[in-house]
């Protein structure tokens, strides 16, 4: 990865290194419930400390309107210390005298976690005065938070313009994984785009279509495409105002000689609830009272056959209402197939987005794909081809 400055370009020994991490992790009553992001960034910050850096962690947490104890990073800092098995000092401010004094007392190899950057309005406004206050605490800036790099905030983008700036190992791993699937992919490339609504995926579909060889449409958004083909979808979720848009996308795929895959059968029920009576029907035989809630066995088989001939897969969005059994079957079986192909060295597989990660967790394959991004909005914006301010600021000019 030559386009971005990484830690390979940085001499951190004895330096105060401001690391923008993403410590905005799920928690309940002050207890972290999913430490995945912390576990992922741990090797990156341990590397810095082992090279003699004074490691200062910056992050937001939640969406506070000013200082609010429930949005303090203190319990998260404790979880970071637990994960690293190293002491971490927590400071209940991120700028000013208290923070400056704590940084001044650090020794090489020490860790310090500062308080929630969003306690200050200057963070989200990318206020130069707030950036300057943060910059006083460091000699070097490391962005290790891809998941917030689509935000031009003080601690993601602003600092990169006032301090020597580098991509941390976690961010580097994301960028290298993405390069493999869209910038320099092994072909054929298949993309799975699922979820409920086309309206939230229009930019994504527009960016992917010219780049992939096969576009697989899943989830409720497939219903709008089916309606455009004149199929009856009963009481299924559908965006009637986007039927023409779905038709246009299919026309563009045909003109570009891209294969567009839609369900050929479906699992239907009259209610979306666990244990509801279900039927498998051909896509031409969806009844008036039916709701399409998952892809059927023939669709699963066809999607798996597409993946078997692909070399690269990018996946965003589930196939069905995976939160409710048995409507998780399509997503789980396709995920299992992707994991097996990846393990056999036949497929490079990158997936991301909130619902996608949750669905892959249900399938139990998160650690068996090439890379699963925990970055929600940033992953989607990257797939849409949009520049991410926090990443662009690290680009070698």
Features from the language model and the residues they span:
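Active-site loop-to-helix "anion-binding N-cap" substructures in soluble metabolic enzymes
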Residues: 1-397
């Amino acid at each position: 990865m030559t386009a971005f400055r990484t830690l390979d370009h940085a001499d951190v020994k004895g330096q105060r290194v401001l690391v923008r991490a993403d410590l905005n992790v799920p928690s309940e009553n002050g207890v972290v419930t999913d430490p995945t992001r912390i576990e992922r960034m741990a090797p990156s910050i341990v590397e810095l400390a082992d090279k003699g850096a004074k490691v200062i962690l910056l992050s937001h947490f939640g969406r506070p309107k000013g200082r609010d104890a429930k949005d303090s990073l203190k319990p998260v800092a404790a979880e970071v210390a637990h994960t690293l098995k190293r002491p971490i000092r927590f400071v209940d401010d991120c700028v000013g005298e208290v923070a400056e004094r704590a940084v001044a007392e650090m020794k090489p190899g020490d860790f310090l976690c500062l308080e929630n950057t969003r306690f200050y309005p200057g963070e989200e406004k990318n206020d130069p005065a707030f950036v300057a206050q943060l910059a006083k605490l460091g000699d070097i800036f490391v962005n290790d938070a891809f998941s917030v790099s689509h935000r031009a905030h003080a601690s993601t983008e602003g600092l990169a313009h006032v301090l020597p700036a580098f991509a941390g190992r976690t961010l580097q791993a994301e960028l290298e994984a993405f390069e493999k699937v869209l910038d320099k992919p092994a072909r054929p490339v298949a993309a799975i785009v699922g979820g409920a609504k086309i309206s939230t995926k229009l930019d994504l579909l527009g960016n992917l279509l010219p780049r992939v060889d096969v576009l697989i449409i899943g989830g409720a958004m497939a219903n709008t495409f089916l309606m455009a083909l004149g199929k009856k979808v009963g009481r299924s979720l559908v965006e009637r105002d986007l039927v023409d848009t779905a038709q246009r996308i299919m026309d563009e795929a045909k003109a570009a000689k891209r294969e567009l895959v839609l369900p050929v059968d479906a699992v239907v029920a009259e209610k979306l609830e666990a244990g509801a009576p279900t039927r498998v029907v051909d896509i031409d035989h969806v009844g008036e009272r039916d709701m399409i809630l998952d892809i059927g066995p023939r669709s699963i088989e066809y999607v798996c056959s597409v993946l078997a001939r692909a070399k690269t897969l990018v996946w965003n969005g589930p196939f069905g209402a995976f939160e409710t059994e048995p409507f998780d079957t399509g997503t789980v079986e396709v995920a299992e197939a992707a994991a097996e192909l990846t393990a056999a060295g036949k497929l490079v597989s990158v997936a991301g987005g909130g619902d996608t990660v949750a669905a892959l967790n249900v399938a139990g394959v998160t650690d068996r794909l090439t890379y699963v991004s925990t970055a929600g909005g940033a992953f989607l914006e990257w797939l849409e081809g949009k520049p991410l301010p926090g990443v662009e600021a690290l680009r070698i000019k």
